Every structure is written in C-alpha cells, then in structure tokens.
Amino acid sequence: LSWVPSLGISFSFHLDGLALLFALLITGIGTLIFIYAGGYLAGHRDLGRIYVLLLLFMGSMLGVVLADNALLLFVFWELTSISSYLLIGFDHERPEARAAAFQALFITGSGGLAMLAGLVLLGQVGGTLELSALAVHGDAIRADALYLPILLLILAGAFTKSAQFPFHF
C-alpha cells in the first residue's frame, strides 16, 4: 500500500519465520506483562492508562519486526521510543520519573536519528527502501564504500535503544 509515494515509502509488511518468531515472543511476553500489571497495579487510578501504553509499546514492536519498508520500520522504531518515554514517566508526579523518561527519550531519539541516516543511505545504495528487496542485493551493498557508515549508523541506533555501552545509564 503506497503511503508517501514521492519518498518511496510504502505501508508494507513481511512475515517470514524470523518475523513470526519475534511477533510471537512480543505478543506472548506482552500478554504476560499485561497479566502481571493487572495484578500489581490492581486498584491503581491509572491502570487503564498503563494498559494503553503497554499496547502502544507492543504494537510498535510488532511494527518493527513486521515492517518491510525501511522508513516504516523507522516510524515504528520511534514509536517504541515515545511509548518507552511514556512508560518510564508513568509516575509523572515524581521528578525522578520525569528526568529518567526525558533522558531515555533523548538518548533513544538521538540514536534514532543516526539510524534514520543509515536507513536513508541504505536505501540510496540499495536503490529501494523495501527490506525484502534490499536483502537480495546484500553482496552489492556490502561492497559499496558507504557500507561501513551505514552499518555504524544503524548500529548506533540499535545500541542506544538497547542501552548498550556507552549508552547505558
């Protein structure tokens, strides 16, 4: 489904064995978290809000693993940053929660910009933004002079999202 045709962005998804495995992990673990949160936060005035935020986070993660367009993947990637910010700052009345949420958003947002640059370069080198088509041209992409910068930019985004050294706090 064409989403932003002038930029070559399509609303496309791809389900293979690996994507299915991760989708099942996301929904399975997400369901367990829902059950736990319901018991742990029973009677909490904002229980409905935590459920909405957990659904947003889970849906964003599903979008990341199922997206077949690099820029669509980026949109879902950033939605995980936003939902993480909202979940970390769930107890927003506490200054510590607000500070931690902002710090997480700043770090993951900065890494997301690096990832976006890497994905745009990848699309330029590969001639498409469709991940399934890019996979076919892997050898040509690895042979390109921009391969190392592309790899480092995408890894920077992944490392900031997963709080890998030196992006952990």
Each language-model region and where it sits:
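...captures the hydrophobic TM-helix bundle architecture rather than a specific catalytic motif
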Residues: L1-F169
